[in-house]
Design a protein with these regions (language model features):
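Short, low-to-moderate order helix/coil transition modules at the start of elongated helical scaffolds
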Residues: 1-216, 226
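Conserved beta-strand/loop scaffold segments within soluble protein domains that form the structured core
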Residues: 119-394, 408, 412-428
Length: 428
């Protein structure tokens, strides 16, 4: 595993409990190593570049904006640092894995600080960090923990309802280096609060850049709280993007997630949701669209740990060229989780006879009064629909585009915020 376990002095080196947590992460990753096809949870997704290339941890003093210019001295008119967002948002930015100030002016009752600031100031952050992640089960989360430093602590206080989303923009400019960076986010939505959080991952500069972004988020949704969580993964086509979100939802809480993946050579978005108390619910939807030789993996694990909980999943993918789509979806119903509902559906559209989709739906049911279902299917574009559209004067390429858009539409319609929905639709 060249270049992944390195000696690096990290902030907070004198904090005993933090050093202990980092050491546990380092030991867990050293024991497990990189996941391979023999690892059940990774049997369809190969981390090709991670086992072959050397990687460099980025230097913080290389302060760059998204196009590679020095921060505050950008001369590129089309750079994202000069672009207006398509919807109002509180914007937070990361460049090459490092937070770039300033903080936006936030309403009362909303705390946002870097993770290291929070771990030195906030007992809330210290008491929650690392509690939702099983390091032995998730080796790349263990690797992330070994380098635990960069990331955000977001706390939405009791009863606060945000008037616009928090947008976390992540931009990579590798400058020809094989960069490797880890981000760790801790998000708390307290009882009765409501928020939207959007994450974007993109590159600027050379599209053939090789880099590895390893993201872990721990998310707490309180009683009767609501979190709508959106993500766009549009990394460079030779990058590797691996993300794990571990979510805990309390009584009456609602967690809504939508992930759109279209970039990276290997991209994996994994979410683990624990519905811990009655009336907790989760809706986890995703779309992926790719071509070339890419592999895009969507993995979900919904754990119904209490009675009267509900979950729904809808995942749709479009695969072209020699690319491969992966969906692994697990619904676990604990013995005491009676009168629970869990639904899961995956559909894929294959645009090439070389395209591949691997699907592994799972139901683990240990209660008898439940309503659960799962389904999966893949197919090609309807030739009759194509013929009909061609006969109406629509050229073949436009007809294909329209049919693909229509195929993905019912997944995108699950996004409640119309501005975000239209923006993501334009990106996909």
């Amino acid at each position: 595993m060249p270049g992944l376990l390195q000696n690096k002095e990290l902030e907070g080196a004198g904090i005993v409990w933090l050093e202990t947590l980092r050491r546990k992460g380092r030991e867990a990753f050293a024991a497990a190593g990189l996941p391979t096809p023999k690892t059940e949870a990774w049997k369809y997704t190969r981390l090709r570049m991670l086992g072959a290339d050397d990687f460099v941890l980025p230097a913080e003093d290389e302060i760059r904006c998204s196009c590679g210019c020095e921060e505050g001295h950008c001369e590129h008119e089309n750079c994202s640092c000069r672009q207006e967002r398509p919807f109002p948002a509180y914007v937070l930015g990361f460049r090459n894995g490092f937070f770039r100030p300033p903080h936006p002016e936030l309403p009362e009752g909303v705390e946002v600080m870097t993770l290291m600031e929070a771990l030195q100031l906030e007992d809330e952050a210290k008491s929650r960090l690392g509690k939702l992640i099983e390091l032995e089960k998730y080796p790349l989360a263990a690797l992330n923990t070994a380098y635990l430093q960069e990331g955000l602590f977001i706390n939405i206080r009791r009863g606060v309802r945000l008037d616009k989303p928090i947008l976390i923009e992540n931009c990579t400019h590798s400058g020809g280096q094989n960069l490797f960076f880890n981000l760790r986010h801790l998000i708390v939505v307290e009882n009765g609060a409501e928020a939207e959080i959007i994450e974007t991952y993109a590159y600027h500069g050379e599209p053939k850049s090789r880099y590895f972004s390893n993201i872990v988020s721990e998310i707490y949704v309180g009683r009767n709280a609501v979190l709508r969580h959106y993500k766009l993964q549009d990394e460079a086509f030779k990058a590797c993007h691996v993300a794990l979100a571990a979510v805990q939802v309390k009584e009456g809480g609602r967690y809504r997630r939508f992930c759109a993946q279209k970039g990276a050579d290997v991209g994996r978005d994994e979410v683990v949701v624990s519905l811990r108390e009655a009336q907790a619910s989760a809706r986890v939807d995703a779309v992926y669209k790719m071509s070339g030789w890419a592999t895009l993996d969507t993995t979900t694990d919904i754990r119904h740990l209490s009675a009267h909980t509900c979950s729904e999943q809808l995942v749709k993918g479009v695969v072209d060229g020699d690319a491969k789509g992966v969906f692994q979806g697990r619904i676990h119903i604990a013995p005491d989780a009676q009168q629970t509902e869990g639904r899961q559906l995956h559909r894929a559209l294959l645009l090439s006879d070389r395209a591949e989709v691997d699907v592994k739906p799972e139901l683990e049911i240990f209660a008898d009064d439940v309503k659960c279902s799962h389904g999966a299917a893949s197919g090609e574009l309807d030739e009759e629909q194509l013929f009909y559209m061609r006969s109406r004067g629509i050229d073949a390429e436009e007809a294909r585009r329209m049919l693909v858009e229509a195929f993905l539409d019912d997944a995108l319609l699950q996004i409640e915020n119309e501005n975000v929905r239209n923006w993501l639709k334009g990106k996909i």
